[in-house]
């Protein structure tokens, strides 16, 4: 059965739940330590957040039980009308385009997200000390934690996404696969290391240095590309201090400055299905868009996808034409912030409009509807998160970027092993071009 996509204004979509926490709401009481609503919803389908009351062992057992659950129900093209109020336009479009193969398994909701207590202590301090620029495009000051647990603007929500807890220093072992409608798969194996200086607890002031985020990507395979690398020094004040980047060229065995990668710059490893500011779903400057904080809404979103931690995203059993197998997915009902970004008239970007859905418990963007210059839904992004005890916290196990017009999709996923989370900063100089060159020569 074909299902047509109904274009629904965002303000109508927010009728399910559209509220911003009042300033009087207290962190750790009505709100969780990161600013989510602690209470469940009226019908009990979203439970109260209580992950802070569990020991590490009890939380681990909880996660193990989750992996053994069966779906409460499965949404198909045949019963879609019953559930469409909980779905993003991108998901509705997937049903319209692929009614025979696409479905959504919906499981019980578990609010498993939590993070170290010391980050909670700093988040409370950020209520007084965190600051953004007048334009909202730069983060000027914050202690190690979410800057804005009670956001009043869309920019504050997006800065929360960009600075959310992901550990201090991370080494990720990933597979990246472009999947075409004929199931031709083009894959890369990479190691990505990132360091967020924001979470350095030795800082004596909330004021932020211009260089604050460090990123290095190293290609392991295939053989024709192995050895190449990309180093980025990024900024939380990107208008004053734009990012710097270098590439490592295997044949030359040296680092070379490269044009800054940002906004809608193409990324070679995704065949144009993902642009530079879509790394981590969204990253970098906010200045090319006008931002609107629409409110909060209950939605069905990918969540607690523990099994994806151990599945390669080039596994043929998980791949179908146009999308991954629904059997690999887990959706739950959660509350999200809804943020709309519209391209400014005097700015350039291939995406005219984007709607971001941000999980209230983690501040991670989990879904994105992306529109072209004609305001047609063009692309759709999903983040499948899992809980990582080593972090500890929620982190992406798979990001899926769909081109709804040509049918191809790009996946970035955990390799299942080799990913490490560190609670302390890397050695001094670890992310300098000289250090990278020395390590790559070994």
What do these predicted regions represent?
Residues 4, 16-18, 28:
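Residue-level detector of alpha-helical hydrophobic segments embedded in or interacting with membranes
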Residues 20-24:
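Sec/Tat signal peptide C-region and signal peptidase I cleavage site
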Residues 28-52, 66, 75, 88, ...:
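Gly/Pro-enriched, hydrophobic low-complexity segments
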Residues 417-442:
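Long, C-terminal catalytic modules of enzymes
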Residues 171-221, 279-356, 366-368:
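Extended beta-strand-rich segments in extracellular/periplasmic secretory proteins, especially
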Residues 27-243, 249:
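Solvent-exposed N-terminal domain segments of exported/luminal and surface proteins
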Residues 9-19:
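Bacterial N-terminal signal peptides
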Residues 2-10:
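Bacterial N-terminal signal peptides that target proteins for export
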């Amino acid at each position: 059965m074909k299902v047509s996509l109904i274009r629904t204004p965002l303000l109508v979509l927010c009728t399910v739940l559209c509220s911003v926490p009042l300033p009087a709401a207290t962190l750790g009481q009505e709100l969780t330590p990161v600013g989510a609503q602690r209470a469940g919803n009226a019908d009990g389908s979203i439970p109260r957040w209580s992950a802070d009351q569990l020991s590490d062992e009890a939380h681990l057992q909880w996660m193990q039980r989750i992996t053994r659950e069966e779906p409460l129900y499965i949404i198909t093209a045949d019963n879609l009308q019953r559930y469409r109020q909980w779905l993003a336009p991108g998901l509705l479009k997937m049903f319209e385009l692929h009614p025979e193969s696409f479905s959504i398994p919906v499981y019980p909701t578990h609010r498993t997200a939590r993070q170290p207590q010391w980050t909670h202590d700093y988040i409370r301090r950020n209520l007084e000390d965190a600051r953004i620029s007048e334009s909202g495009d730069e983060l000027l000051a914050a202690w190690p934690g979410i800057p804005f647990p009670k956001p009043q603007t869309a920019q504050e929500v997006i800065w929360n996404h960009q600075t959310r807890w992901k550990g201090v220093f991370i080494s990720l072992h990933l597979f990246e696969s472009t999947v075409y409608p004929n199931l031709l798969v083009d894959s890369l194996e990479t190691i990505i290391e990132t360091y967020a200086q924001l979470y350095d607890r030795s800082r004596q002031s909330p004021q932020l240095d211009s260089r604050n985020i460090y990123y290095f990507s190293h290609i392991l395979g295939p053989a024709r590309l192995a050895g190449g690398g990309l180093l980025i020094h990024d900024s939380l004040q990107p208008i004053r201090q734009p990012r710097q980047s270098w590439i490592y060229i295997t044949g030359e065995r040296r680092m070379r400055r490269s044009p800054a990668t940002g906004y809608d710059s193409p990324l070679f490893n995704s065949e144009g299905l993902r642009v530079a500011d879509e790394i981590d779903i969204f990253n970098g400057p906010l200045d090319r868009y006008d931002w609107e904080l629409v409110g909060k809404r209950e939605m069905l979103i990918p969540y607690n996808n523990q099994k994806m931690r151990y599945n390669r995203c080039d596994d043929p059993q998980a791949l179908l034409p146009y999308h991954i197998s629904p059997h690999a997915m887990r959706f739950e009902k959660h509350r999200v912030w809804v943020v709309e970004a519209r391209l400014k008239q005097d700015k350039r970007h291939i995406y005219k409009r984007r709607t971001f859905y941000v999980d209230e418990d983690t501040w991670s963007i989990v879904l994105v509807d992306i529109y072209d210059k004609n305001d047609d839904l063009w692309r759709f992004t999903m983040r499948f998160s899992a809980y990582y005890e080593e972090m500890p916290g929620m982190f992406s196990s798979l990001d899926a970027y769909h081109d709804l017009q040509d049918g191809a999709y790009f996946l970035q996923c955990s390799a299942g092993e080799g990913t490490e989370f560190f609670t302390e900063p890397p050695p001094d100089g670890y992310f300098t071009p000289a250090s990278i060159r020395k390590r790559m020569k070994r």
